[in-house]
Amino acid sequence: MEEGERWREGHVYQRSSETRKPTNYDRPDSPVTHYVSDTHIVGTLMDELEVETGLITTILIATFNEMRRSHKPNELDDNINWWRHEVFYQIYPRSFKDSDGDGIGDLKGITSKLQYFVDTGITAIWLSPIYKSPMVDFGYDISDYRDIQPEYGTLEDFDALIAKANQLGIKVILDFVPNHSSDEHEWFKKSAAREPGYEDFYVWEDGIPGDNETRLPPNNWVSVFSGSAWQWHEERQQFYLRQFTKGQPDLNYRNPAVVQAMDEVLLYWLQKGVAGFRIDAVIYIYEDEQLRDEPLSGSTSDPNSVDYLEHIYTRNLPECYGLIQHWRQLLDNYTADNPGPVRIMMTEGYADLSLLMNYYEDEDGVQGAHFPFNFDFITELNANSAAPDFVYFIQRWLTYMPPGHSANWVMGNHDNPRVASRYGVGTVDAMNMLMMTLPGIGITYYGEELGMVDYRDISWNDTVDQPACDAGLDNYKWVSRDPERTPMQWSDEKNAGFSTGDSTWLPVHPNYQELNLLTQQEATYSHYKVYQSLIKLRQSRVLRDGSFTAQALNRNVFAIKRELRGQPTLLTVINVSNRTQQVDVSNFIDLPNRLTLLVVGVCSQHRVSERLKPAEVKLSPHEGLVIQLKAR
C-alpha cells in the first residue's frame, strides 16, 4: 500500500509498482549471519521451500543461535542501548488529551497522562508534530521550528512535560519534518521575495513556456496527494516544488545554509531535553538536480496519481543517506558532549527494502539512522495473508538488516487504518503478542493497546484531513486519514474522557462507552491487560537477549520461539485464519516440554497457567498464545 493510497475493506493489497520489481531481496537463498539487537546475538538464517501435491507451503525458518558477551548490565549499557528493545508509543497530540476544554489535545493533557505510561510499562513516547503551524496538514506544515502550536500550549508547557517525563523515567522523541516547511514560514516568505541569503532556500524553477504566455511545470513530477508537484507563485513568478500539499514547499538541501539551519533546530530541541527524533518523509528530501521527467510505471493510466510514475528522481537519492549520516554524527557528538542516554534517530519512509537498509548504514559502514521504520505489517501483510507470508516478511527484514543493528516492527500510525480495522477486531491481541515477542523494537500507535477502531462514518461536514477535503464528497472516505485519528477513548464519560468541551476537533468514535481504558482497566480480561502483560513479559531476559526462530506450521498458523540458555523458552503461536486450528508444535520445540500458557487473548477459551499438550495446541480464529516451555 503506497503513500496516497487508502485501505479498502476486503481488498488484497500488493506492493506498489516501486516494490514489485524483483530484486535480490525477494527471497534469501543462502545462510546469512547477523547481529540482532543490543545483545550481540549472532546466528544463521535459513529457509527451505516445501512443495506438496496441489499446494506450495513455504516454511521459512529463521534461527538465531545465542552468542553473547558475558557482562553484567550497568548504567553505561543502559544509556547506550536503552532504545534497542524499547516500545515507542506514538502520541497524536491533537487527539490524546485535552486539558482546557477547547476540544483539541495539548501538551498539558499529555503531561497529565504520563502516569498512565508508567502504569502500562511504557518508557518512551514519540510526539507527532507540536511546532507552530497553520495546520493545513495538522502539524506537518511547520511555520516555526522553534515554537509550539498555540493550540497545544507554550514552550513552558513543553519544558514542564520534559521535566515530568524525566522524573518518571520516560524518554520523549519529537517528530522532525525536514523535507518541507509551511508556506507561512518566514524562510519561505523571504525566499519568495528573493531576500538575500534566502533566494535558494526552496526549490524554485521557471517552468516551460506554454500557450498565451502561460508557464507549464518544469517536468512531470507528481505530488503524493495527486496532481503536479509544482506550484506557481505569482509574486516570484516561478514554480516551487511541493511534493505534498501546496502549503508545504520543499526546502532546498543543496543549499548549505538550509542544512545549517536545520542542524540548529535539532540542537535547539536536544538542549531542551528530547531523547531523539523521528525524521519524517526522509525519502523525499533530495530530488534530481537536472529535473528529469520520471518514467511511467504502468500501474495506472491516471496522470495525476502518485502511482503513475516510477519515482527514481524524487525519492531515495544517494544524498538522502548522506544527510541522515550527517545528522547521526550531530546526535552522536551531542551525546558525547552531554552525559545521559544516547540520542537516537528513527527515519520514516515507504520504500523498497534494499533502499531502506541503506538508512542503517552505507557499504563502508558509515552509520545513519539508529533504525528506519519497518512498515511490513502495514504495507505487505493484511487480513488475507497466510502464515508463511508473516514468517517470510519477518525473516526478510532480519536477513538483510546490516549486522549490529536492531529490527523494528511498526503496527500502526496516523496515516494508516488501525490494526483492528486492517486485520480485524479479533486480531488485536494476537498482533500485539507478535510485536512484543519479536526481537528488537516495537512501535505502538495510541489506542492500539485498547483495540480502538477507525471511525469510518465521519461525515463530510466533520472531515478535516486536507487530502480528503480535496477529494470531494464522493471520494473523501477512500482518502481520509481522519478515521484513525479520532480522540483517545479514556472512559465512558462525555467525549470519552478526552475533553470537557461541547465538541471535539474530530468526532469521538460512538463505541467509546463500551471500548475505553477505564472499562478495560476494571475488567477481568481486556485488550489493555493483555498489552500490559506483554510489556511486563518483554523485560524477561529471554525476550531481551534470546535467540529467535520462526516457522509456518501450516498455511494458517505460525510460531516463533525465543530461547536463552538457563531461561525458560517462550513460544508464540498465532492463527491468522477465521477457522479454529489445532497444531502439533512437537517438532518445532524439538524436545519434550511442558507447555504453560503465559498470555492469552480476551476471547480465548484458554486461561493463563493452563497446561497444553505439544501435539494438541488448539487455537480459535485469529487467536494468539504466548506459552512458556519447561523441559520435563
UniProtKB/Swiss-Prot annotation:
Coiled coil: none annotated. Its EC number is 3.2.1.20. Residues 1-30 are annotated as: Disordered. The active site is at D280 (nucleophile), E348 (proton donor). Gene3D superfamilies: Glycosidases, Golgi alpha-mannosidase II, Oligo-1,6-glucosidase, Domain 2. Pfam families: Alpha-amylase. It comes from the Eukaryota. The record marks D415 as: Transition state stabilizer. GO terms for biological process: carbohydrate metabolic process. The keyword Hydrolase applies. Residues 1-29 have a biased composition (Basic and acidic residues). One of its GO terms (molecular function) is alpha-1,4-glucosidase activity. InterPro entries: Glyco_hydro_13_cat_dom, Glyco_hydro_b, Glycoside_hydrolase_SF, O16G_dom_2. Belongs to the glycosyl hydrolase 13 family. This is Maltase 1.
